[in-house]
Amino acid sequence: MPTRLAVEKTIKELLARYNAEDALLFGSYARGDETPESDIDVVVFGGDHFKKTDIFAFAEDLREALATNADVFEISEVDKGTPLYDSLMKEGIKIFR
């Protein structure tokens, strides 16, 4: 099970690799109640230089680097006012490139 520090470090590296602006870590890793069965939940803020198709490679690289499941979204995929969006704004931990 990766530590939160390892998760944040890997996300930072991937943000730089894919030229994305920043990300939000949310879910159990953000709350600090992750278990060996937990996946990693991330929303990427791609920005102007991030190709929308890079989200798939970003997700796969995150899964491979940390040897665990990960759910990765680009912020444009998340509708405001939904439970997912509300969860992001409430518990999300911002990770800067």
Residue ranges and their predicted role:
Residues 1-22, 30-36, 47-97:
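Catalytic core of pol beta-like nucleotidyltransferases
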